Amino acid sequence: MVWLWLGVGLLGGTGLASLVLAISLFTQRRGRKRSDETSSRGRLPGAASDKRGACACCYRIPKEDVVEPLDLELGLMRVATHPPTPQVPRCTSLYIGEDGLPIDKPEFPPARFEIPDVSTPGTPTSIGRSPSHCSSSSSLSSSASVDTVLHQPPPSWKPPPPPGRKKRPPTPPVRAPTTRLSSHRPPTPIPAPRKNLSTPPTKKTPPPTKPKPVGWTPPVTPRPFPKTPTPQKPPRNPRLPRTVGLENLSKVGLSCPCPRPRTPTEPTTLPIVSVSELAPPPRWSDIEELLEKAVQSVMKDAESMQMT
């Protein structure tokens, strides 16, 4: 331990050194205590010759042998190793007809007792007991007292009714007719309808209505007012005027003049005509002039729209 203490001190851990020292002291003290307990167990007086069932707290140890007070663990171990002797169960059952024992309202028909055989005098008169635990004094009881106990049921007991018959309910009392005069009149009987008589059909009258006031006029149904004329929509933007050159171009591409009217007898094939034969191709100067005119007309339309 000294070398351990020096090694821990050299490491420089003062807290760890104190903890190790405390653990070492605790283990040394506990080892001494266990050695004292094992040495004191053999000094119990009469440990092998005393009676079974005794407790460790019943021993009286001399003062010179007592080193430490008897620990509770020793007593518990003593009780565990030497259990108490089992006690013989006492007889608590009741004898029928035995002198000196009271019989308080025995059950009838008996549930706990059995009817004894009176013909044999040696039969015990109680049930639930073995002859080894109880004395045989009950066999000397007289059979006359047994008969008197069995044949005298308690006054509160009544025999059950036979199963075939049922209890009849009590008849209600008959009331005599009253002779007092009453002011209640019986209802008048409705006459029976006669046969072979046709009753004329009755006309149902409508329920009366309330009289109308003098200046009352029927409500006027509301008439719908004429619809207001919808304002006319503004005119749409006028289309740009088509130029002559563009019209000629479209007509040239779509027109197909025939020299004479077609007859149904002739074939449907048309002669091939070239575009150059019908109209000469346009020049670039003409196209530029047409574009300038179109731009000028568009500008005029835009100025007129802004002015309006």
Curated annotation (Swiss-Prot):
Residues 152-163, 219-238 have a biased composition (Pro residues). Residues 126-145 have a biased composition (Low complexity). Its main location: host cell. It comes from the Viruses. Coiled coil: none annotated. Residues 1-22 form the signal peptide. It is found in: Host cell membrane; Host Golgi apparatus. GO terms for cellular component: host cell Golgi apparatus; host cell plasma membrane; membrane. Residues 105-274 are annotated as: Disordered. Keywords: Host cell membrane, Host Golgi apparatus, Host membrane, Host-virus interaction, Membrane, Modulation of host NK-cell activity by virus, Signal, Viral immunoevasion. One of its GO terms (biological process) is symbiont-mediated perturbation of host natural killer cell mediated immune response. Remodels the host actin cytoskeleton in order to impair immune recognition of infected cells. Mechanistically, interacts with members of the host WAVE2 complex and redirects the complex to the plasma membrane. In turn, the efficiency of immune synapse formation is greatly reduced. Interacts with host components of the WAVE2 complex ABI1, NAP1 and WAVE2. Also interacts with host ABI2 and TLN1. Belongs to the HCMV UL135 family. This is Protein UL135. It comes from Human cytomegalovirus (strain Merlin) (HHV-5). The gene is UL135.
